[in-house]
Design a protein with these regions (language model features):
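Fold-independent oxyanion-binding glycine-rich loops
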Residues: 30-31, 45, 63, 114, ...
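Glycine/serine-rich phosphate-binding loop and adjoining beta1-alpha1 elements at the start
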Residues: 1-105
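Rossmann-like adenosine-cofactor binding region
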Residues: 141-232
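General beta-strand structural signal in soluble alpha/beta enzymes
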Residues: 25-28, 53-56, 135-138, 188-189, ...
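Structural signal for hydrophobic packing residues in well-ordered secondary-structure cores
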Residues: 4-23, 43-54, 85-93, 116, ...
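Conserved active-site and cofactor/substrate-binding residues in soluble primary-metabolism enzymes
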Residues: 2-6, 33-37, 41, 72, ...
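Adenosine-phosphate binding glycine-rich loop
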Residues: 88, 207-292
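Glycine-rich phosphate/diphosphate-binding loop of Rossmann-like nucleotide-binding domains
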Residues: 68, 72-181
Length: 292
């Protein structure tokens, strides 16, 4: 951890000194291999190098809540993707065109990646939509169960063992690259870019691809999938949930007022005015202890 902290802080120092990071220029956020911890380190470096900037917390988003972060940022991308999928299934005409089953829960889902995005997406799909997730892919292999994986149990296993392997939730396949070749109705690449390319695009057997990762399909493969009739929901729309919540965090840091504070004050002021009106009308006084 110390080595990672030193690397992060050194890199952040160089970017900040060159003017590449500030609340008004570039505002980084977590991605593959990083978390709120690294964002907190970057914020600390910015504060030490720019002590005069009162908006220093807005130099980066995805921070820990105690460091100026916002509730819900960690799971925002995954939850946003689930909302996108739900919205797609509300459009029955598009669902029919994609040759999918009308109800989301009746479709087989494969998710590549079980990190921050994939894990929260799987959790929402499983618990909110009763979805059938038949395969989860990670760096070391694939967990497959044609009857559907118990996502809640898998999350417990991963938190304890740090791997999707060594459990009784399904069959483990040791070739992680085969995840995009698993036959399914909905394929969700939620890890790295370029996972669907000229080497495997012809082996993709799905009806709908939801681009949870950034650029998981290369341009040439995108054309091939289009010609095959595969519906693709683009990453710029699908994974915007994280960016949206990052914006709210940024605004909160710039305004220096947490969300709900102004509304609370407004409601308090409105209540006091109502009490004054009642007192004036009835010629009575309200116990001050009741107003507190």
């Amino acid at each position: 951890e110390n080595q990672l902290r030193n690397i992060t802080k050194t890199f952040a120092t160089k970017l900040i000194k060159k003017g590449f990071i500030s609340p008004a220029i570039n505002v980084p956020a977590p991605d593959v291999g990083t978390s709120e911890r690294e964002m907190g380190w970057i914020k600390d470096v910015y504060k030490s190098l720019r002590p005069e900037d009162i908006n220093y917390r807005a130099c980066v988003t995805g921070k820990p809540r105690h460091g100026g972060g916002i509730a819900g940022r960690t799971e925002a991308t995954g939850r946003g993707i689930e909302e996108v999928i739900r919205e797609f299934f509300r459009n029955k005409e598009e669902v029919k065109k994609a040759k999918l089953n009308e109800n989301l829960k009746d479709n087989r889902i494969v998710i590549q990646g079980f990190g921050n995005v994939g894990r929260h997406l799987a959790y929402e799909l499983y618990n909110r939509d009763n979805a059938k997730i038949i395969a989860i892919g990670e760096y070391n292999g694939i967990l497959y169960n044609e009857n559907g994986i118990d996502i809640n149990k898998l999350i417990e296993c991963v938190l304890f063992k740090k791997t999707i392997e060594n459990n009784d939730l399904g069959k483990f396949i040791k070739n992680p690259k085969e995840i995009v070749e698993v036959e399914c109705d909905i394929l969700v690449p939620a890890a790295l870019e370029g996972v669907i390319n000229k080497d495997n695009v012809e082996k993709v057997k799905t009806k709908l691809i939801v681009e949870a990762a950034n650029g998981p399909i290369d341009p040439a493969s995108d054309k091939i999938l289009f010609n095959k009739g595969v519906t693709v929901l683009p990453d710029i729309y699908v994974n915007a949930g994280g960016v949206v919540v990052s914006y709210f965090e940024w605004v909160k840091n710039l305004s220096h007022i947490r969300f709900g504070r102004m509304e609370k004050r407004y409601q308090e002021h409105k209540l006091l005015e109502l009490i004054k009106l009642i007192e004036k009308t009835t010629n009575t006084k309200t116990d001050p202890e009741l107003i507190k």
